[in-house]
Amino acid sequence: MLRLVAACPESCVVCTKDVTLCHQLTYIVAAPMTTRVLIITDGYLSSIESTNLSLLFNLALLSLSRNGIEDVQEDALHGLTMLRTLLLEHNQISSSSLTDHTFSKLHSLQVLVLSNNALRTLRGSWFRNTSGLTRLQLDGNQITNLTDSSFGGTNLHSLRYLDLSNNFISYIGKDAFRPLPQLQEVDLSRNRLAHMPDVFTPLKQLILLSLDKNQWSCTCDLHPLARFLRNYIKSSAHTLRNAKDLNCQPSTAAVAAAQSVLRLSETNCDSKAPNFTLVLKDRSPLLPGPDVALLTVLGFAGAVGLTCLGLVVFNWKLHQGKANEHTSENLCCRTFDEPLCAHEARNYHTKGYCNCHLTQENEIKVMSTVGSRKEMPLLQENSHQATSASESATLDGSFRNLKKKDRGVGSTLFCQDGRLLHSECSEPPGNMRAFNEAGLLTTYNPRKVQKLWNLEPGEVQPQTLQHHIIRTEDISSDIFRRRYATPASALAGESLEKRLTNESWQPPIEKEDNGLHPHRQRHFITSSSSKPCEPEEHYVQKIVQKNRSKYDDPCGLLKQSKPRYFQPNNSLICKYVPCEQFEDYMKEKKPNRRQHSKPEKEQIQINSAIEKFLMSEDNIDLSGLSTKTKKAYSPKRVIFHDPDLVEINRSMMSPKISTPWKRQKNQSNQLTKLDVKKFSNTGERNKGEKWFTNSWVLKRKRTPQSDLKGKIKGQNLKLNLHPFRKVRVHPEKSLSSLPKQCKQVLLPPKKLSKTSETEAKINTVCSADFLQQSESSNYVRLTSKRLPLKHDSKQTPYYQRNTKRAPLLSANNLRVVNQSSIESSCYSAGHIPDGNTSKLPQPTPTDAEHRHSHSQFSTEQMEDATQLESKVLSYLATTWENTGSDVLPFQHSRRATDQGTTESTEHMGQNVSKTSELNQFSLSPRNQTQLLDAHKTDSYNKEYTLDQNEALQHREQNSSHAQLENKEKTLMTKPQISHQIVENCIMDKEENDVEKKLSKTETYDSSLIPQTQSKNNLSFMKTNSIPYQNRIELPKDISTSPVSSQAVWHLTNSSEKGIDSTNALPRNDGTEALEIKIVGKEEKNMLDESKTDSSMLTQISQMTLKGITKERQQTWENGTSEKYILHDASSAEETITAKDLSITSSHETQNRILCSEVDPEVNSNVHNFREVQNIQPDKDSAHKEGAMTVETHEALSFLPGLKDSFEAENEVFLVPSRINEAENSAPKPVLYPPSAEYATTSPLETE
């Protein structure tokens, strides 16, 4: 073999003849043959090969440490016969890389260092030929056990030093060291020895032993070693290294006495040592094939299972949806030429097809049945309020149950509350069942319809059902005649026909109706019945016998009285067929359609109105009644004369009324609100029109104002002529049919003025409520009416909080709140000022009649009243200051001004006499001259009889005298009762609470009405503050008259314009007159319509101040203190200011959404309160003046609580008809409730 000779590399430190020292080499350098020492460290040798080592015969020391050696070739060291020391520490040599012949030629080897390698086991065959080995270092490896074969078969009789430290040795065999008899030093430290037999007794030469840093377990198995160690350390020649570290592990409780191995004995050892031996074998790592396969199989199975589950769920949903769709098609679709019940079994490929689709997401698409020449659309418009009762649920359940049955001809289908109601009867085809015209003819606006079917007494209790159905106009002129001659199926179809045949019709949708913008262009397919006509008397008789046929209904639709589900808000969204597709289709299918001329369309509209009027549930005909009889008319009969029906005059029984007619006579007069799209002639308009809320009709045909004023009293009806507006008109529920409702007290209808009509054009959601006084009313009750609002559904939660939290709610307050409410059904009228049953909504301008009745009432009651009236009168003046100017700083800007503004302007428009205006603007609470004006208005009240007023006064005064002895006690407790009764009246809206709520309401009426009579608007003033604060925004002009707002509470926004100048004025009579004049001038500048209003108001205010001056002087004579006088003066002053504010915003009121019709009742109440102040006499005694202030402070003590409850509900805007204008209007003032001490201070101190 050639010897490779190379020069000494640069990395070699020493290159001599005997020694070669290199580092960081990747190979073994070719040293000279004479080299005795070869040291190569910190290199990168992966293996030891025979190259350049086989010829180093003289080599005695070979050091290859820290080179990363992993493999040693079998013959790499065979030429080193003279090698004595072999250093291979800090490498990666494993047990498998050493064979039995690796060290076989090293006969002279004495020191073998294999420290810090990867040795796991020891085999004695490695050292078979190394008999001269004296030092063996195996520390820092991974040796786990020493068995008998570890050194067995070796010839290491010369071995003196054995280092096995820092390994993983946990087991040592009993004869492991027997082949090594000459051992002198043994190091077994830093291992995992817990149990070890006595292996050191054969080693007689042992002088150094190290056993520390192990995990000794002091059991009885370790007792032999402990005994050896105790004997071993007795000799001074023996050394036990780190004997103090031979501690037992705290594994058992038995070692408490033997904490060290040296102290372990038979007495303190633990005999219950675990009897097992952990033997770690050197085996190659198994591939995780089975585990991976198992995991793969499990994962695949799980994925397949989840996929299958998802498919099953999807399939189930799909089938369920198809089943629902199929059910919808079966139930709502049929061809027009077949019986109604026969469509369930027919094939869908027969003549004609239906494309209706009724889903469960409250959505009804256009349901049209297209035959050879007929189509019928059924539409359901969006509705904000849909309260389902038990009848709808029962009908829906019966409808589904009847799916599988075919009961013959005569079944009826219509949609109600988001459900498709189905009614059948098994009568013969000749006996047609009348359809529920009250539901089908309801024009677009949701109505409270009571008892669509009159049930038998034992079956179902009266339920309230609210449904939203679109009434569409008929097209052919003879539909009205044929309507009741056709079967119920054709009846249902024709009642929902659209007014055009094959033309795109755009209903007049106004700008604020954003919800209908996507549906401006709508195409409707109309159809006409193909059934022959029957005589006219026949269909009228069918309508009369409609309720009777319902009792005999054999279909069992109403057998289940309990509702299965209750959906409070169930809106329906209509999806319409595109215009282009229908035009193409209709051109293809029906090219010979006849277009109706304009006279025919008008005639159709007239017939539709007549039909609607006949079938309406609450129609009341007053055309044949006298003027005095109209006020007490009964809504149980409807008489209508149709010119097209040969003047058939038949009494139609309202389907809503299910009780005997005798009970109807005792109930209060019902308010009928009829919504008809168009009346084409003046005669029908005079009969049917009462209130216009849409400019569409006004654009179509403008009726002269004189015609309206002359004919408007003919009928107490309300019209909503917009076809797709979200305006809802709610009729009054009768007390007999709804025992839980309160009775009504009604006022006669008033004329429609120019101002109100102008406001009606602007405000699309204005609604008029006409009430009338009833002679038979034992209690004064109010039934809440809902004002048609666009956003009322969003305001329902706020209303509920407001009504439940307000401690001083009264009837008038709830009246206003309930107009924007959805769910309120009634409220008590306990806090009616002066017990006047007729002081209720008064939207129309002509208020002379109402004022007269109120004045006459108050005048007669004045005679029997005690001093409490005078006390409360002072309280009312201050309360009017506080609530009108402080509690509600923006009260007069929008709402309260409606009354003053519209009345003032309307009286000017109608040329009402100055006496009425003086009565209207009388501001002094103690001006007796105004009382005469109230009596002068007797001439304006021709429809009210004195007997009615006296009868009601008599009842109320009798209960009033019973309450006079509880003056202050009743004053503090009655508002709480009002809150409880009102809350109960709202919370007990459910049908199961009818009786309880009725009893509570009656008790409340009998006790609270007389109390409020004697206390004169005490609760009324507090209740008016709630709606005003909640919805009225403060205009900038209100700051012109905050003079007396300092009297009790401070107005936060009152210091905008004129508070500085007015506060600087001293409080005397001249200053007050000057202030009123200034206010009048400012209002005169603001009013563009009428300058005479402001001047007249200034004159009236001066007259009032004169009366106050007289009263002040008279009070000084009686010796009353100054604070009482100033209190009264500020009361009159602030009352005048509040009244003036009503005029300041009159120009703004007409341009804003909230016209007087939106909140007619509150405006009337504000005006009536002023009349109460005008009517009350002026008491001269100083005692009464003092009592007034005392009563005022007592009442003011709980006003902060009321203020807090009002302030909590500031975010509620109850009538946001035009939300854009409401948001862009003046900023809302923030009210800060006064503290208790500030509220109870005297007016002088506060000022």
Swiss-Prot record:
Give the signal peptide as a residue range, or say none if absent: none
Report biased composition (Polar residues) as residue ranges: 898-927, 1238-1247
Top-level taxon:
Eukaryota
* Entry membrane topology: Single-pass membrane protein
TM ranges: 294-314
Phosphoprotein among keywords: no
Q: Name one Pfam family in it.
A: LRR_8
Is Transmembrane a UniProt keyword of this protein?
A: yes
The UniProt keyword set, sorted, is: Leucine-rich repeat, Membrane, Repeat, Transmembrane, Transmembrane helix
Please state what the protein is called. Leucine-rich repeat-containing protein 53
